[in-house]
Swiss-Prot record:
It holds the Pfam family GATase. ATP binds at residues 232-238. Residues 13-204 form the Glutamine amidotransferase type-1 domain. One of its GO terms (molecular function) is ATP binding. It is an enzyme of class 6 (ligase). This is GMP synthase [glutamine-hydrolyzing]. HAMAP family: GMP_synthase. Residues 205-403 form the GMPS ATP-PPase domain. InterPro entries: Class_I_gatase-like (IPR029062), GATASE (IPR017926), GMP_synth_C (IPR001674), GMP_synth_GATase (IPR004739), GMP_synthase (IPR022955), GMPS_ATP_PPase_dom (IPR025777), Rossmann-like_a/b/a_fold (IPR014729).
Length: 528
């Protein structure tokens, strides 16, 4: 079982050493789907540090380097003497082979990228329940030339003789493919075999267990002190509000700053939902005029973001002093933010760890240091999908738990060019129609994001035998798993027709609706 450490923090049962793979976080997510707690740490973590962490298993991630390159990242060789099962994935497998006495070479003419059928040679142990011929995702330009002593082949593909290998006695395993990606059809079976059967991990990473632990830790940290939370209405801050309410009750104060860029009816809904229905203390701050005045004449999207962020900080600072004093600031920092700030990424040219600037949480990342808050971040262990599960278990309604992502600057960056009250009213009405029609069609939860964009141009039209010169609205709908990549959603033609007809007929100032059919990449989901 993942036991708490001396500071009350849960210790990971599985640790992933990150060698710079784009899939390292995904490996951790897949392990957690087996109800086992896992974390991503830097590849340079020493064997002594790992011994103190006492994980049940270690996974070596993939990476962009070649193990024979001059500055290739390597793990502490003493790891192989810890007596802990190890699974190497892609680069991780090649590193295992090289450090234990085998050989790796460039796969000249035999590099594999994309899907490949896996031919299973030994269906026991790691490959139990992995079907022969099942599709696995390949992404490698190197291959194993010679196995270390004690290793055997478990599987192969047409171009990769050593697609899966193992030293069964020492419980060292390597796979040249990526079992963590959705394209690998039996990837989860392999991960379960390693985590649950080979490592013997208990399945104790459950939503209810997390809630109980988080509540206890918040109570211990905060005591009788007051906590302030900037509430946006998104799933992260909403889940955090419910968790803190459960932990410390009326010691929590939420501040909802209405900057005037939210969707139609949202401020009223949020105040009724949190303050009246669930008795969470929410201070409503109407700052609409301040924000719209600051954006007068501003057209550059980055300038808009900076101005909105700066003004948010000013309002937050003023109101926190008025409502305070507060000892703690609650933030919805999630685990991907923690990973980025820890700098587990790798520069393939130098082999050095690269620190990536942590993402600022919704609007509060640049709070002045003189506010002197201590931070409460009980969600910092969780991925986004885990936050949704926690919110659901705490009683958040589905309309918030499964709410489409919404940018911090709100509609201000969905209005291209200068933001005015007239444009905001126009876009709110159009955006509401988009969401209503997609919900009525039963497609809302099948789409990652669906919204309207107002362009800073006008087009000629004809309505009631009269010439019109009005704004066009862009319909933007995308499908995605995590927002990192996205494909434009193929909406039914009759649905697009209903949306277009309603917007043109019901929204004053609009005479044309167009569809954005750009995927990400090359485009981004938002226009600004």
């Amino acid at each position: 079982m993942s036991q708490p450490s001396s500071d009350g923090q849960r210790q990971p049962a599985i640790v992933i050493l990150d060698f710079g793979s784009q899939y390292s976080e995904l490996i951790a997510r897949r392990v957690r789907e087996t109800e086992v707690f896992s974390v991503v740490i830097g590849y340079s973590t020493t064997a002594d540090e790992l011994r103190r962490m006492a994980p049940k298993g270690i996974i070596l991630s993939g990476g962009p380097s070649s193990v024979y390159a001059e500055h290739a990242p390597v793990c502490d060789p003493a790891i192989w003497d810890l007596g802990i099962p190890v699974l190497g994935v892609c680069y991780g497998m090649q590193l295992m082979v090289q450090q234990l006495g085998g050989a790796v070479e460039a796969a000249t003419g035999k590099a594999e990228y994309g899907k490949a059928p896996l031919e299973v040679d030994d269906p026991t142990d790691l490959l139990n329940n992995v079907e022969n011929g099942s599709t696995m995702w390949m992404s490698h330009g190197d291959s194993v030339k010679a196995l270390p002593e004690g290793f055997v082949r478990l599987a192969h593909t047409a171009n990769t003789p050593e697609a899966a290998v193992a030293n069964l006695e020492r419980k060292f395993y390597g796979v040249q493919f990526h079992p963590e990606v959705v394209h690998s059809t039996c990837g989860m079976a392999l991960i379960r075999n390693f985590v649950n059967h080979i490592c013997g991990c208990e399945q104790d990473w459950t939503t209810n267990a997390f809630i109980d632990e988080a509540v206890a830790l918040v109570r211990e940290q905060v005591g009788q002190k007051r906590v302030l939370l900037a509430l946006s209405g998104g799933v992260d801050s909403s889940t955090l509000a419910f968790l803190l309410k459960k932990a410390i009750g009326d010691q929590l104060t939420c501040m909802f700053i209405d900057q005037g860029f939210m969707r139609k009816g949202e401020p009223e809904f949020l105040m009724e939902f949190f303050d009246q229905k669930f008795n969470i203390n929410v201070e409503y701050i109407n700052a609409r005029k301040r924000f719209i005045d600051k954006l007068k004449g501003i057209t550059d999207p980055e300038d808009k973001r900076k101005i909105i962020g700066t003004e948010f900080i000013r309002v937050f600072e003023e109101e926190s002093k008025r409502l305070g004093p507060f000892d703690y600031l609650a933030q919805g920092t999630l685990y991907p933010d923690v990973i980025e700030s820890a700098g587990t990424n790798v520069d393939p040219k130098t082999g050095e760890r690269v620190a990536v600037k942590i993402k600022s949480h919704h609007n509060v990342g640049g709070l002045p240091k003189d506010l002197r808050f201590k931070l409460v971040e009980p969600l910092r262990k969780l991925f986004k999908d885990e936050v949704r599960k926690v919110g659901r278990n705490l009683g958040l309604p589905e309309e918030i738990v499964r709410r489409h992502p919404f940018p911090g600057p709100g509609l201000a960056i969905r209005i291209l060019g200068e933001v005015t009250d007239e444009k905001l009213n126009c876009l709110r009405d159009a955006d509401l129609i988009v969401r209503e029609e997609i919900r009525d069609a039963g497609l809302y939860h099948d789409i990652w994001q669906a919204f309207a964009v107002l362009l800073p141009v006008r087009s000629v039209g004809v309505m009631g035998d009269q010439r019109t010169y009005a704004w066009p609205i862009v319909l933007r709908c995308v499908s995605s798993e995590d927002g990192m990549t996205a494909d434009w959603s193929r909406l039914p033609y009759d649905l697009m027709e209903r949306i277009s007809n309603r917007i043109v007929n019901e929204v004053k100032g609009v005479n044309r609706v167009v569809m954005d059919i750009t995927s990400k990449p090359p485009g981004t989901i938002e226009w600004e």
